[in-house]
Regions:
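Membrane-embedded transmembrane helical bundles of large multi-pass transporters/channels
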Residues: 1-36, 135-378, 493-686
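Surface-exposed, low-hydrophobicity interaction/linker segments
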Residues: 36-38, 104-105
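Structured non-transmembrane domains adjacent to transmembrane bundles in polytopic membrane proteins
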Residues: 46-68, 72-158, 375-376, 382-543, ...
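Active-site oxyanion-binding pockets that recognize sulfate/phosphate
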Residues: 40, 380
Length: 686
């Protein structure tokens, strides 16, 4: 059946090539229609309290939660009021709040509440709280930047989303371009034809283009998927095409009288099992992300799994067709291997493998403990460092006015007496520096008919009363999360299970709840699924344990490094890398164990280790270094610190996995040999 399918592919190779070229071209246009979402809060589960609160508020009120802070330096009160009018006139700006919304600015400020005044006006600097609608976010942020100039500052989620949108597109293109150059370089070193690297890149390019185009089925993808999807697909799928072409060359060398078509069919039949098992473990590892409640997980997991599947389809259909068309050029451009052999390295590893295995065993438990005791960032507040305009602006605003966030409490309309009691209770919380509400601005005893309609619709609408809280707190951290719990508990006393609370800090609190709950579930599923596949492949228990534990230890070491360096970790990067590193690098361990078992049929175990290292090093270094390079490129080029950290994790993880597979895993296989090997021959030990 398999042979018949492959025979049909090679005989209809020009039709196959035409179909893939057409699919790739169509995918280029389709990928342009895929929307990218840069707002991390959009990926909260639909049943999270803050998501429900936002939906309730958006259905009842026309204006959203303030999502930008704008600071203008060296202005008088009249000048600040003029800036407020200009800000409000910008297309996409829904609302602007300043001091005049809380106090009568015609009265000398020295005679008014200092805390309230300094929330909005301090050291001749005016701080405006702005609400920008999502649909016109990019244009509004650009217009505000033009209005205030380089000497003033703006920050907030609307700004970070706009900056991420503008920067990621160019950064991803730069990363991809350099990654392709590196992959071409490493392929030139590790292949024996000048044309072969171009064929491999053509196959990878077709698979990546089609994967990007078929993302249209999702409608919208996350910024993480947009930034990491293609380069991850490039790194993890690189060896499939190389393996097939090498099998084809081996078959032609072994059967010089056979036709190229027959050799290709033979190569496909011989390589299908190895390539499929390698791809399947990677796909399963990525699919574990689908179980995350935090929706970036399913978004990235499905896109990556789809990408690997498409890469496999490409290898078994497009690559045979392309290779058969181009193999005469491969023959003409054949050259001697540019890399030296790894025989000496194999003998070196056979000498140091036991100390390496012991060293890994010693650091295994400390690495596991350290990797689980990092300090985390959960939201978007720290995505841009002070080396960026946004990071510098955020620091400048916080230096003058302190950390601040805006939350919204929704309670049922009416019963202004209870609302007044709630307002008093909220004012009593030290971190609450101001409240805009019906009872605070109009007064509990004032009937709605006497309140100006424009003011009333901002505070009371759709059966709800809205209380806008300004809190002196960061958007995440222990203090911010404790404040969320305190405010929720306070409102619960007056409106038991009949209120909603929304805001950036509140959403980040729910993010923390969601993604920490995902951690154990996703990791256990990924490890369990990969282990089960290995169990079915190897039909024994010990070898899958050794292989999975080796890669898991590499993951623990990778994630322990920030702990020992005293660095915070983005929990999303932590969660994603745990699954991706397993899926992307367990192939190295599988390949090594497969070749070791083959060599043990004719060699003693020490010779088999040396031969295995010598044989697999080129293949493992090709894919491992590609993963590391694209990761480090992402870390170096991305101004988004979440993406940058994810990239650095990929880079370090690829190198650590590479080192463990080539240096320590041989020692474990050597020690476990009597339990995992049943050789056909039992040669004497050298």
């Amino acid at each position: 059946m398999l042979k018949r399918f492959y025979t049909a592919i090679v005989h209809r190779r020009r039709a196959v090539l035409a179909a893939f070229v057409l699919a790739a071209v169509l995918s280029v246009f389709a990928s342009r229609a895929v929307q990218v979402d840069y707002d991390i809060n959009d990926y909260l589960p639909p049943d999270s309290p803050s998501t429900i609160a936002l939906e309730q508020m958006n259905s009842a009120f026309t204006g959203g939660i303030p999502n930008m802070r704008v600071m203008v330096r060296d202005v008088t009160v009249p000048e600040a009021l003029d800036y407020k009018e200009k800000l409000a006139a910008i297309d996409g700006v829904e609302a602007v709040t300043w001091l005049d919304d809380s106090l009568d600015v015609t009265v000398p400020l020295q005679m008014q509440d200092t805390a309230t005044v300094e929330t909005y006006y301090k050291d001749n600097c005016a701080l405006f709280t702005v609400t920008v609608e999502d649909a016109n976010r990019l244009e509004a942020v650009a217009a505000i930047q033009d209005l205030i100039g380089e000497d003033n500052a703006l920050a907030g989620t609307a700004v970070s989303t706009a900056v991420a949108t503008n920067s990621t597109v160019t950064e991803v293109a730069k990363i991809a371009a350099i990654a392709v150059v590196y992959v071409l370089f490493i392929l030139i070193l590790t292949t024996d034809s000048w044309v072969e690297p171009l064929l491999v890149l053509a196959g990878l390019g077709a698979a990546i283009l089609i994967n990007n185009g078929t993302n249209l089925m999702f409608g919208t993808i996350s910024f993480v998927t947009n930034a990491a999807g293609s380069i991850l697909q490039l790194a993890v799928s690189l060896d499939y095409s190389v393996f097939l072409i090498h099998r084809f060359a081996e078959c032609r060398a072994a059967r010089p009288d056979a036709s190229a078509e027959d050799c290709m069919v033979e190569a496909l039949c011989k390589s299908t099992g190895s390539i499929l098992s390698s791809g399947l473990t990677t796909v399963i590892g990525f699919l574990a992300l689908v179980l995350m409640q935090f929706q970036i997980g399913p978004d990235l997991g499905l896109a990556l799994a789809k990408g690997v599947v498409l890469s496999l389809v490409t290898v078994f259909t497009f690559m045979p067709a392309l290779t058969l068309v181009c193999y005469p050029w491969m023959d003409k451009t054949h050259h001697k291997p540019l890399l030296p052999g790894f025989d000496k390295f194999g003998r070196f590893v056979s000498r140091i493998m036991l100390p390496a295995a012991l060293a890994l065993a010693v650091i295994m438990v400390p690495s596991y403990l350290a990797s689980n005791n990092n300090e985390y960032y959960y939201g978007a507040a720290h995505m841009f460092g002070t080396n960026t305009r946004l990071g510098a602006d955020t620091a400048a605003i916080e230096e003058t006015f302190g950390k601040s966030d805006t939350w919204v409490v929704l309670v049922p309309e009416g019963d202004t007496a209870t609302q007044a009691e709630l307002s008093d209770a909220l004012h009593a919380i030290p971190e609450v520096t101001g409240i805009l509400s019906y009872v605070d601005n109009a007064g509990a005893s004032i009937p709605p008919e006497l309140v100006p309609p424009d003011t009333l619709k901002l505070l009371v609408s759709g059966g709800y009363t809205r209380m806008v809280l300004t809190v002196n707190a960061d958007t995440e951290g222990d203090a911010a999360f404790a404040l969320v719990e305190k405010v929720r508990a306070t409102v619960q006393q007056y409106y038991p299970d009949a209120y909603d609370l929304a805001g950036q800090g509140v959403s980040t609190y729910d993010l923390m709840d969601t993604i920490t709950a995902d951690m154990v579930k996703v990791n256990l599923l990924a490890i369990g699924a990969v282990f089960l596949i290995l169990l079915l492949m190897k039909r024994q228990l010990l070898l899958p344990v050794i292989l999975v534990l080796s890669i898991e230890t590499a993951i623990w070491i990778n994630l322990a490094i920030p702990y020992f360096r005293g660095r915070h970790v983005f929990y999303i990067a932590y969660l994603i890398i745990s699954t991706i590193q397993l899926g992307a690098t367990v192939d190295y361990a599988i390949l090594f164990s497969d070749r070791y078992q083959e060599f043990r049929e004719t060699l003693d175990k020490k010779q088999a280790i040396a031969a295995t290292v010598s044989t697999v090093t080129t293949s493992v270094i090709t894919t491992g270094s590609a993963l590391a390079v694209v990761g480090f490129l992402m870390g170096a080029i991305s101004t988004n610190q979440l993406l940058g950290q994810l990239g650095n994790f990929l880079g370090v993880g690829g190198l650590v996995s590479l080192a463990i597979v080539l240096l320590a895993l041989p020692g474990y296989l050597y020690l476990a040999d009597p339990l995992i090997i049943k050789p056909k021959k039992q040669p004497k030990e050298a």
